[in-house]
C-alpha cells in the first residue's frame, strides 16, 4: 500500500483517462491495458511488478469470457504480462515476455508457450483455473488459490521448483509425475503451519522423485527445507572427516 501511495503521489494527474493508455508511473514504468483503470489500480499493478523497476507492463484487467492469443504482434519481449480479475477467459502466450503475474482470476485457462526471460511466474488468489506450461519455468509461485491445475507439458520444462502457500486443492502435473497439495490436509498432520505464512516447495530430489517439503528458516534467516538442510549437514560432516 505504501508503494502504491508513493506512486500515486508521483503522478501528474493531468487529463482524462482513456482506454489503452500508456501511463508513466513513478517516471519509470509504462502500463498498457484495454480498460480504464483508476490511479490506485494502476499504481497497485506497477508496485506488484517490483515498484517501478519493470519498464513496461501489459495488463489484462477484469476481462470476461475472452479468448486471446499473445504473439509478436501484440506483446513485446520487454514487457511484464499481468492478468488480474479475469473470469472465464482463455489466454495463450506464444511470444517472449519478461515475467508473468496472474491474480484474482476465476475459471480461466492460461497456455504459456513463449519464452519467459526471467523464467518466473507468480499466481495469487485465483480459483478454478488451469496453467498449462509449455516453456521453461524456474520459479512458479502459487499462493492463496483454490481448485487449481498446474501442468508442465514435459519434466524438463520445470527447471527449478514450485513454491505454494495457503492453497486448497492444488493439482500439479510435471510430465508423467503427479502431485496433489492441500493446506487443510497438511494442517491435519502438522499443526504448526499457517495459511498465510507457511510455504512449501515442490521439486525433484536427488533420486529424481517429485516431492513436496515445508520451507523452514535457518538461524541466519536463509530459507531451505529440512531435507536440503540435512543433506548440507551430511556433506559438511563428510568434508570435516577428510
For the regions a language model picked out, list residue spans one by one.
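Feature marks extracellular polysaccharide-active and adherence modules
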Residues: 84, 92-94, 103, 111-113, ...
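The right-handed parallel beta-helix/beta-solenoid scaffold, focusing on the short coil/turn
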Residues: 79, 87-89, 98-100, 106-108, ...
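Intrinsically disordered, low-complexity terminal regions
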Residues: 1-73, 144-242
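Short, charged helix-to-loop "capping" segments that act as catalytic/coupling loops
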Residues: 113-119, 157
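Active-site-proximal segments of catalytic enzyme domains
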Residues: 51-83, 88-94, 98-100, 105-115
Amino acid at each position: 500500500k505504501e508503494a502504491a501511495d508513493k506512486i500515486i503521489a508521483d503522478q501528474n494527474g493531468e487529463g482524462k483517462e482513456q482506454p489503452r493508455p500508456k501511463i508513466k508511473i513513478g517516471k519509470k514504468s509504462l502500463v498498457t491495458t484495454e480498460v480504464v483503470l483508476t490511479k490506485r489500480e494502476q499504481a497497485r499493478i506497477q508496485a506488484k511488478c517490483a515498484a517501478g523497476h519493470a519498464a513496461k507492463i501489459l495488463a489484462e484487467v477484469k476481462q470476461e469470457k475472452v479468448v486471446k492469443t499473445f504473439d509478436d504482434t501484440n506483446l513485446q519481449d520487454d514487457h511484464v504480462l499481468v492478468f488480474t480479475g479475469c473470469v472465464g477467459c482463455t489466454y495463450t502466450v506464444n511470444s517472449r515476455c519478461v515475467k508473468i503475474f496472474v491474480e484474482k482470476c476465476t475459471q480461466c485457462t492460461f497456455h504459456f508457450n513463449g519464452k519467459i526471460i526471467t523464467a518466473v511466474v507468480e499466481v495469487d488468489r485465483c480459483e478454478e483455473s488451469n496453467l498449462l506450461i509449455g516453456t521453461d519455468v524456474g520459479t512458479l509461485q502459487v499462493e492463496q488459490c483454490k481448485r487449481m491445475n498446474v501442468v508442465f507439458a514435459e519434466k524438463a520444462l520445470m527447471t527449478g521448483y514450485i513454491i505454494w502457500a495457503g492453497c486448497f486443492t492444488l493439482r500439479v502435473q510435471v510430465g508423467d509425475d503427479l502431485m496433489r497439495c492441500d493446506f487443510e490436509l497438511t494442517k491435519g498432520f502438522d499443526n504448526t503451519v499457517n495459511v498465510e505464512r507457511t510455504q512449501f516447495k515442490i521439486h525433484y530430489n536427488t533420486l529424481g522423485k517429485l516431492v513436496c517439503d515445508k520451507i523452514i528458516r535457518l538461524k541466519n534467516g536463509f530459507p531451505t527445507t529440512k531435507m536440503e538442510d540435512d543433506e548440507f549437514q551430511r556433506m559438511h560432516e563428510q568434508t570435516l572427516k577428510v
